[in-house]
Amino acid sequence: MTIAPITGTIKRRVIMDIVLGFSLGGVMASYWWWGFHMDKINKREKFYAELAERKKQEN
């Protein structure tokens, strides 16, 4: 009685690595975009809006 060889292990591992890589990459990119980038952009936009309001009041 022989045991059947295990097949498809490398293919499964490669697919799992690719899926995991894209998933983690997407999560980290989303965190960077919404957690860091948009915070900086909102601060900059707020500064320029206040600056424009001050210039508008001076004139």
UniProtKB/Swiss-Prot annotation:
Record carries keyword Oxidoreductase: yes
Residue ranges, Mitochondrial intermembrane side: 45-56
Organism domain of life: Eukaryota
GO BP terms, alphabetized: mitochondrial electron transport, cytochrome c to oxygen; proton transmembrane transport
Topology Mitochondrial matrix: residue spans: 2-8
Recorded metabolic or biological pathway in which this protein acts: Energy metabolism; oxidative phosphorylation
Major subcellular location class: mitochondrion
Any one GO cellular component localisation term in the record: mitochondrion
Alphabetized InterPro entries for the sequence: Cyt_c_oxidase_su7a_fun (IPR014368)
Propeptide section residues: 57-59
Keywords (A to Z) from UniProt: Cleavage on pair of basic residues, Membrane, Mitochondrion, Mitochondrion inner membrane, Oxidoreductase, Transmembrane, Transmembrane helix
Localization per Swiss-Prot or TrEMBL: Mitochondrion inner membrane
Spans through the membrane: 9-44
A GO term for molecular function: oxidoreductase activity
Membrane topology: Single-pass membrane protein
Misc: Present with 35500 molecules/cell in log phase SD medium.
Function: Component of the cytochrome c oxidase, the last enzyme in the mitochondrial electron transport chain which drives oxidative phosphorylation. The respiratory chain contains 3 multisubunit complexes succinate dehydrogenase (complex II, CII), ubiquinol-cytochrome c oxidoreductase (cytochrome b-c1 complex, complex III, CIII) and cytochrome c oxidase (complex IV, CIV), that cooperate to transfer electrons derived from NADH and succinate to molecular oxygen, creating an electrochemical gradient over the inner membrane that drives transmembrane transport and the ATP synthase.
Assembly behavior: Component of the cytochrome c oxidase (complex IV, CIV), a multisubunit enzyme composed of 12 subunits. The complex is composed of a catalytic core of 3 subunits COX1, COX2 and COX3, encoded in the mitochondrial DNA, and 9 supernumerary subunits COX4, COX5A (or COX5B), COX6, COX7, COX8, COX9, COX12, COX13 and COX26, which are encoded in the nuclear genome.
Family listed: Belongs to the fungal cytochrome c oxidase subunit 7a family.
Protein name per its UniProtKB record: Cytochrome c oxidase subunit 9, mitochondrial
Taxonomic lineage of the native organism: Eukaryota, Fungi, Dikarya, Ascomycota, Saccharomycotina
Gene assigned in the entry: COX9
